[in-house]
Amino acid sequence: MARGGLGAEEASLRSNALSWLACGLLALLANAWIILSISAKQQKHKPLELLLCFLAGTHILMAAVPLTTFAVVQLRRQASSDYDWNESICKVFVSTYYTLALATCFTVASLSYHRMWMVRWPVNYRLSNAKKQALHAVMGIWMVSFILSTLPSIGWHNNGERYYARGCQFIVSKIGLGFGVCFSLLLLGGIVMGLVCVAITFYQTLWARPRRARQARRAGGSVGTKAGGLGGLGTRPAFEVPAIVVEDTRGKRRSSLDGSESAKTSLQVTNLVSAIVFLYDSLTGVPILVVSFFSLKSDSAPPWMVLAVLWCSMAQTLLLPSFIWSCERYRADVRTVWEQCVAIMSEDDGDDDGTCDDYTDGRVCKIRFDANGATGSGSRDPTQVKLLPGRHMLFPPLERVHYLQVPLSRRLSHDETNIFSTPRAPGSFLHKWSSSDDIRILPAQSRALGGPPEYLGQRHRLEDEEDEEEAEGGGLASLRQFLESGVLGSGGGPPRGPGFFREEITTFIDETPLPSPTASPGPSPRRPRPLGFSPRRLSLGSPDSRAVGLPLGLSAGRRCSLTGSEGSSRAWGRPWGPGNPIFPQLTL
């Protein structure tokens, strides 16, 4: 772009300056709208959504800084013949343009790689913290792009004829051979990686997965034919990754794993990523690579190369929003985008993870699964956590609940919430308990014992009375009978004493060797009482509880061991719901 006269090449550049400026403003608004639309439609930002937002942000910077700078300088030169590029503006333009060009190439390649990873290895993708890896990839992309693109500004250029000496000759052949070769190789690597990942994704989606599904159905059908008595094996669906939400004892979301996408959503996202990759390769990657190759070969930079590079860069910033808008998953209306803008401007600090911190109303946040690990039919969206009133945190319902990555001492435990403070009505107690759960009941007069001195004086007599009552057949009772007689008083009157001590229940919960209190083994024959203290065999209210510092007078009157099989539906009685509450909060 040598200065002097209004030659044909100068006239062509200046005639396009106003168009570049208008298209840059339109691209800036369109990409900003796309970022707000994705944020409004997807409350939980996944790796693909994050990469799409970063790609749109890169296009905003491309339209706002280098392209707008080039257009403004050309308009200024058209208005004043004395104005021209200076060294500082040219260096800023070259550094920002090549930084954003490389960042766009690598972000598109990373987008296609994450989609291939999610389709080809779905379980590994969900267990590998892909969101953090996407953030690290973006930081690495920007670091590499910025370092390489700023090297020409600090001396890595052709010293014979510097690219900013006459105008601003930003084609790679005018900057330097070393920079041109490195830039072309990095650009070629990003293009090839994106195309390979898209090809693997399409193969996995269109051929490999349906073929494996057909093979699984044929294998299941043959097994079902051989073992027809088992039933249902021939029609077993293909494996799907369950949606898992990990919560602490207060229901606070700690981490989550997304489940398998529906066929419609998977196809939409795959088509969108593939379209973005082909858009970039056809409009930006390959044209810039061809221009760089021919410019290095001929050691020249004619005006058509400048026009081709700038218009290709502008075209991709305009077409990306239209591609994302065509995907129904990320299409938001004006009202939704406006609400998202208001939420961002108001800087609302409320929790947006679908959980609640205040559990004084007795609600429990949880995600339920069936026995095969699939999500229940009640809620397919893992971000929408259901608040179920009237549920107690000590005992899960019939359907299996997956509490993952929560320490045993924190699982259904007492650390962060006081679940023993609120008294409940007699009708809110458990209506039915498993017949395999045996509860020993001592006489009513034994519950009125005093402190440890009285208990030590009558311990042997109480043990003899226990054995006599058990021999007579009156030592076993249901949990409901135990609670009504021991906590509520006989005849449903006012309570005469506490049901269990807090230390008793928490010790039972924390010291159980199984994944949860609900998964204890089946009943076993009664064994002689061991002489030594074993915390894993400590029953609620046993005399041995003195080793953990429990009051002995009241704990001696209640001895309880809760057992039951996890696989038995009778272990939890009839189904629980808001109209059929379960074990309430116990009082002290």
Curated annotation (Swiss-Prot):
Keyword check for Repeat: no
Coiled-coil features, chain-numbered ranges: none
Residue spans of biased composition, Low complexity class: 530-540
Domain of life: Eukaryota
TM ranges: 18-38, 50-70, 92-112, 134-154, 175-195, 276-296, 304-324
MF-aspect GO terms: G protein-coupled receptor activity
Function field: Orphan receptor.
Name assigned to this protein: Probable G-protein coupled receptor 162
